[in-house]
Amino acid sequence: MAKKVVTDLDLKDKKVLVRVDFNVPMKDGKITNDNRIVAALPTIEYILEQNGKAILFSHLGKVKTEEDKEGKSLRPVAARLSELLGKEVKFVPTTRGPELEKAIDELKDGEVLLFENTRFEDIDGKKESKNDPELGKYWASLGDVFVNDAFGTAHRAHASNVGIASNLESAAGFLMEKEIKFIGGVVDNPARPLVAILGGAKVSDKIGVIENLLTKADKVLVGGGMTFTFMAAKGQEIGKSLLEADKVELAKGLLEKAGDKLVLPVDAVVSKEFSNDAPFHTVSADSIPADEMGLDIGQATIDLFTKELQGAKTVVWNGPMGVFELSNFAKGTIGVCEAIANLTDATTIIGGGDSAAAAMDLGFADKFTHISTGGGASLEYLEGKELPGVASISDK
C-alpha cells in the first residue's frame, strides 16, 4: 500500500509535527557527528518553504532515571540545526505542559521549534517507549498534521511515532520515503540479479535476514565472524574462531536449503590473538590452524565476491567482513566496499550500522545509491517484518 509523503499534505499555515531522528553521538555536550541532523534538512526546509510551522522532536540515547538526563538534552542539537538552516530554532526544554503549548501557539509560519528529548517521558513509566495512548494523543493535539521522518526508530512502536500517527493525518518525510523506496524495494521488487552481502559477528543477529533474503536474492555472500558457524556446520576446522555452537544445526539447515545460492569465504586471515600487533597470515578456509582464529576474509574471497557481484542489478550490503576496527583485519571490508562502489549499472544499498561507517570512513559514501540511516530498522525490513513506524503512516 502506498503511503502518503510530505508533498501530499497541505502545509500552509499548519502546525506540522515532525518526528526526526536526532539521536546523534555526543561527547562532553558536543555533537561528534551531525549526519542525522543533515539528513533531516530536506524535509524541514520543504515544510518552511510551504509556510508551515515546523515542530520537531526526537529521542537521544536511553533515559530511565533522572540521572540519565545528564548529557541527553537536545539543546546542542537545536544550536547545530540553527547553524545548518541559517535561522533561529526555538528550543523548549520540556516535553509537555504550558511552556511548550505557549511556544507552539506563538510560532509563526516558516519558523522552527525543537522540544526536549522524547525519552524524558520514560522516567515515569516508560510512556514514550511503551506507546502510552494518552501521551500520543497529547502530542498529536499540539499539531495539525504529522510527518514521520525517523526511519531509525521505525521498527519500534513508540508514542512519538505510532502514538501520534494513530490520532492525526500523517505522512512520510523525504528521508523515510527514500528508505521505504530502497530498503523496501530490495524486499518487494528488486531489479535482478539481486546480490546480498551479509557480514558481522553473529549468525543469531542475521538469521531472519539470511532466511528472508535466501527467498529473494539470487546470491547471498556471507563474511564476518558468522561465517565460522557456517564453516563448522560444513565440518570444517575453524580453530579458535568465533563460533555460536547452538546455531550450528540452524546453519546446516540454511546451507541445505540454499544450495549454491549461499557463498562462503574460501580463505581467512588468521592470528593467534585478537590484536593488531600479533602476527597474521592467510590460510585456506578449510585449514584454519587449531591455535588460531579467523579475523577477516582473505584476498581470494575478495576476488570471489567481486566476481559474484559482476552483472548484479541490485546489491544490498550489511555488516563488515572482518574486525574492521583493527587495520590488519580491515582489508576484506575495504575490498568488498570498493567492489560494490565500482559497480556502474546497479542500485547499491548499505543497510546502516558498521557498513555505513566503513563506506564513509573510506570516502565511498557518494558511490552508493543509498546508505540507510537505520541499523535495526533496516535489518527488520530486510527480514520482511512490518515496521510499526511505517505501517502507521496514512495510506494515499
Swiss-Prot record:
Superkingdom of source: Bacteria
EC number, as in UniProt: 2.7.2.3
Pathway(s) annotated for this protein in UniProt: Carbohydrate degradation; glycolysis; pyruvate from D-glyceraldehyde 3-phosphate: step 2/5
Catalytic activity, reaction form: (2R)-3-phosphoglycerate + ATP = (2R)-3-phospho-glyceroyl phosphate + ADP
The keyword Nucleotide-binding is assigned to this record: yes
The keyword Kinase appears for this protein: yes
Subunit note: Monomer.
Protein name as it appears in the record: Phosphoglycerate kinase
Source organism per UniProt: Listeria welshimeri serovar 6b (strain ATCC 35897 / DSM 20650 / CCUG 15529 / CIP 8149 / NCTC 11857 / SLCC 5334 / V8)
Lineage, broadest ranks: Bacteria, Bacillati, Bacillota, Bacilli, Bacillales
